[in-house]
Structure formats: structure tokens, C-alpha cells
Amino acid sequence: MGQLMYCRRIVRCVAGLSMLRYVTVFAGLFVLAACSRDAAAPEDGATPLRVRLLTGEQYLNTVASIFGEDVAASVTPPTPPLTRTDGLLASGAASVGVTSDQVSQIQQAAQFIAARVLDEEHRDFLVPCEPASDLEPDPTCAGQFLRETGRLLYRRPVEETRVAELVDVAGRAAEQAGSFYDGLALALEAILISPEVLFIVDEAEPDPDNPGRERLTGYSLASRLSYFLWNAPPDDELLQAAESGELHTREGLARAVDRMLSSSRLEDGMRAFFDDMLAFDDFNSLAKDPMVYPMVTGATLADAREQTLRTILDHLLDKERDYRDLFTTRDTWMSMPLAAVYGLPTENGWVPYTFPDDSHREGLLTHISFLAANSHSVRSSPTLRGKALRELFLCQKVPDPPPNVDFSALEEAGDVPTARERLQVHNSNPSCAGCHLITDPMGLSLENFDGAGRFRETENGVELDISGELDGIFYDDVHGLTAAMRDHPKLSACLVNRLYAYGTGGPVELRYDRDALARFTTRFAEQGHKLPELLRDLALSEAFTRVRPPESPEESVVNAAEPPQSQIASTTR
């Protein structure tokens, strides 16, 4: 057993060096690709080659898809914190890597997964063959398992030289441990800590139909499609389509995309996207003061997050309704913890619910998830709500406050009864007024809802004025705000922007992507703002499948080499 531990240390050492060196390998590949291309101008809407880390959820989904939910259930994803980039954590995955401490976490997770896969409970249905002896190496059986499992984990076929190396690792470890399955576990661990498993690596090839242009390889396209639509790795059928070349034909790609869109796994993929787009990761640390809002518990906030996701998925996927109507619909879902905050009677579990016509609730902006997440722990915040409205749904970045702002005047206004009066302080300060004028008029229209999202008509005994304005549209109440939001010209364009960035693995670059995004937005409107149609348009587009060359080989080296070692430091400080 001591010698087996020595073998494990050798495997981990080699994998650790691979983790630190892999960027050099990929950088070299990118440079060679750049040198092999002609000097044609970048393809309109095409994306750069990217190397992006699997998110924590994608890591767990990968394990679950290949080995089963029960194996994944006890795994802590060994992924570093991600920085939200242009509104998405998923885009931040293209600019983050791993530190030496995280390499250790990756190794621990791999050891746990490998041990579970090959224990007596799982080996009989996860290993496709039976060894000649449980006590000795069996190169044939080991090779079959490692070849088939490696193909799913690497998301492409495993080169035979690599299979031979892994079989050798399994054989040597089996001899030392006196166990075929212990040896196989060590070889599986070596795969699981491979950078090619932990990172989604775009690879390009010349496009024979467009000389001088490049496209994603079939396997890279399969990964892009599956993590976009399913938030999970390609299944066997999608890998077969990549291997046969079907994904590089219009008919074959359309068949694959239509199959994925009709799968129940699409709901998982879109749940992950909207959870990211709405910054619902903030709920992981969100809390309300129990003295002020005793009815709001961790379970309440978790249900608030779930309510909005259920509403979105039911509206867009199950009923295939207009995306814009999410901001005016009265249809939602309700649970008992939420009903206490909404002031409604309800049953146990989740039930569909429609707010009556005379209710002040309509659309996502009146959900507890939006109202509570964008408030302080003891009170509402028109500024936070207006900022979130613009950034989440209109893709308009609101600047942070200047570092030298004096908040003393606002603090001294504590005896002023309403938020509208308190915020007049900002409007009298030139360094504050500019930003507050683009956030507060909309946020004040939501002051009928307190910091927990409960409806109210007064604040500190004073009747609330909830009139407001959104980009030239004036209204008297929250219904006017939701209508103005539904019809805002930037609303649909923002969803297109976010989906394109999410699907292609990094933030959009308007100098390259502007025309493609405009075309997608126009088509989205022509098709009634239906999400499945938009997803299909994106996935079948040349912009999604084409690759543009870097502006210089040096740019390729920097982009490929930074994530694993340098940029992670900035995300953890």
C-alpha cells in the first residue's frame, strides 16, 4: 500500500506539472494556428479561440452525466471563485485558472470520484468488462474502461498512446496494491486531474467551404453546444455526430440542435443561464435582519430564487411565450414559505399561482427575488433596484460611486420619512446626481415593496409616491414601470447579448459582434421573442461555429497563458 501511495504521488506530480505547463502547450497550438492562417480580416461575428474553466455546476454535471447522480452528490467542485464579467460568471471562466492550492483540491476530488466509481457498489455497472482476476492487472479490460470513459471525460476520443500510458499506470498500481480496481482507480484519477477535462478548450481547423477561414473542430463544437444548451458535457450521440462530421453539415447540425432543444436537459441548461444572468449567486450570502423581517429565513430566500426560475422556465420553455411578457405576467409559482411573505394562503409544495388583476404584483420586477436581493438588510433601496434593473435586464453598466463621496448628509437625513425624500440629498450633490438620475426614478416606483418584498402603501406613516420615469417614458405606478420595461428597445437585445456570450464562452466584443447581434435581435423579434427559436438561431449560426484569428501571435500566448497562474490571484484578493 505504501508503494501504491508512491504511485499516486508520482501521478499527481506529473498531473500537477501538466496543469501548470498546459498553457504553454495550448499557447503554442494557438500560435501555430495563427501562423497557418492567411491575413484575412476577422470573420464578422466569429469568436476567438478560448480556454475556459468548467464552472462548479458544470464540473458536477460532468461527473453526474458520466458516473451518475449518486457519485456527484458528495463531490465538492474544486473550482476557484469566478469574477462576474460583463454580467456573467460564465464569461469570467474564460479569464481564471487554478492556483497550487486549488490543484490540491482538484486532486482530492479526483481521488474521491475514482474511489466511488470503482467501489463494489458501482463497478459492476460502470466498468464495461470483468477482469480476469480482481487481484492482478488486466490490460484489455483496463484499456476498454479507460478508452470509453476517457472519451466522455475528454469530450473527444483518447489517443491510443495516451490509453497505453494509462493502462500502464493502472497495471503498475494494480501490481503494487494487489487489486485490479485500485490500479484502475489511480488511472481514472489521472484522467480526472487532466487539464483537458477541467478546461473547455476551443480548437480550430481550416474550413474547406471557406478558404482562409477557420471553424471549430467537430469535438469543440459539440462541447460548445452541450455546455450552452445543457450545461453538461456532450452525450454519446453528440460525440458520434462530431466524429462523423455531421456537425459540419447544415442538416446534421440542425438535427443535433433540434434534438438538444427537445430534450428535458434543456431546462437544466436554461436554469443555469438565467441563474447566472440574474446574479442569483448573491442569494448564497443574502440575509435579512431577523428583527426587522422575522418572516424571511434562508428557506424563504431559497424559495424566492426558485420561484423566479420556475416562472421563467415555465413561461419560456413550457408555454413558449414572448420573453417580454415576463415583465408583465401575473402567472407564477408559489410555496408555503413564500406565501407568508406575499400574504397569501397556499398549499404545501410548489403550486402554480396567478395574481389577481387588482394585485400590485406583475412580472419579475415584483418578485421577492428581485426586491429582496436588491435591498439592504433592514430597508429597501431604490438605487440598488434601479441599478439591477439596468444592469441585469438592459445590459447598461451603472458606474460605481466615486471614492471620495461624502455620505454624511444622507446619514443625517435618517429622520426623513420616505426614500424619495432621502434621495433628494444625492440629487443636490453633482458627483452623485448623474448616476442616481439613471437608477432612482425606476427604483422609487418599486417603493411599494419593502426590503423583504412585502407590499406596503406607506413608509413611516407617509403615503408613498411611486411615480417614475424610464428613459423618457413617464408613469404613475408599478404597472407603468413594468409596461415600460416590457417595451424597452434594449430588453430583447440584452438577452441576445447575454446568451451569445454565455454560449460562446466569453464576453462579446462589439467591434466584431455588433452586426451578428443585431441580426439575432431582429430575428428574435420576427419570431415573437420565443426563446427556443433564439437558441436555435444562435446555435446554427456561422457566428457560433466560426473562429476568428487573433490579432497577433503574441495575443494568443497572453490570452492562453494568463488564466491558470496569474489571473486567479486577482479574483481571490
Predicted regions and their residues:
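Bacterial N-terminal signal peptides that target proteins for export
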Residues: 4-25
